[in-house]
Regions:
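Charged, alpha-helix-forming regions
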Residues: 1-112, 119-173
Length: 173
C-alpha cells in the first residue's frame, strides 16, 4: 500500500494525545521522512513543528476543544449532518462491515472513528484502501471544511488523506 505511512501518520495525529502518544512523537516525526509526496511530507513536518512548539497541556487542551467539545468537528464521522438516527445506524453498520470484510473487528471503538478508519485503510491492499477512503470521502470532506471554518490545523491532515487517496485512483484532489 503506497500510502500506508501517510495514513498511519494521519491516524496517529488524530488520536488523543495520551502519555503513550507523547512517547511516540519522536518516532512518528522521524517517519515523516518516508513520506514520498513532498507536499504531504511538508504538511506532516509543519504539524510536528506545531506539536513541538506547544506545551503538552496547551496541545491537549486544543485537541479536547477541537474534537471532544464540538459536535461540528468531532472524529465520529456519522454524527456530522445527521438528524436521522436510523440512517446514522445504517452508516455505522456499513462502516463496521468495512472492518469485518477486511478481517478486523473493533472492540473498544465505534467503526466511524476517523483514526480507526485511517488505520484500517493503512493495513489493507491499495484497492481496499481506495474502497474504504472512497466510502468515507464525503464525510472527510465535510469534516475538513468544518476544520477549515474553525481554523484548526487538522484540516491540512485531511487534505493529505484526500490527496493521497486521489493519487491511488489516478484523480487529483
Amino acid at each position: 500500500n503506497r500510502i500506508r505511512n501517510e495514513l498511519l501518520l494521519a491516524a496517529y495525529l488524530f488520536e488523543y494525545p495520551s502519555a503513550a502518544w507523547w512517547e511516540s512523537v519522536p518516532a512518528c516525526a522521524a517517519a515523516v521522512s518516508e513520506v514520498e509526496r513532498p507536499q504531504s511530507r511538508a504538511v506532516f513536518e509543519e504539524f510536528f513543528d506545531y506539536i513541538q512548539e506547544s506545551s503538552q497541556g496547551e496541545f491537549e487542551d486544543a485537541y479536547v476543544r477541537a474534537f471532544d467539545f464540538s459536535q461540528n468537528t468531532n472524529l465520529y464521522l456519522t454524527t456530522h449532518n445527521r438528524t436521522d438516527f436510523g440512517k446514522q445506524s445504517e452508516e455505522l453498520l456499513r462502516y463496521k462491515q468495512l472492518f469485518l470484510d477486511n478481517g478486523f473487528d473493533l472492540h473498544n471503538e465505534l467503526p466511524d472513528y476517523l483514526p480507526a478508519l485511517l488505520e484500517l485503510a493503512s493495513a489493507v491492499s491499495e484497492s481496499q484502501a481506495l474502497h474504504i477512503l472512497t466510502e468515507v470521502q464525503p464525510k472527510l470532506e465535510l469534516l475538513r471544511d468544518r476544520l477549515i471554518e474553525a481554523k484548526l490545523p487538522y484540516a491540512f491532515l485531511l487534505d493529505v488523506v484526500l490527496t493521497e487517496a486521489a493519487g491511488l485512483s489516478g484523480r487529483t484532489a
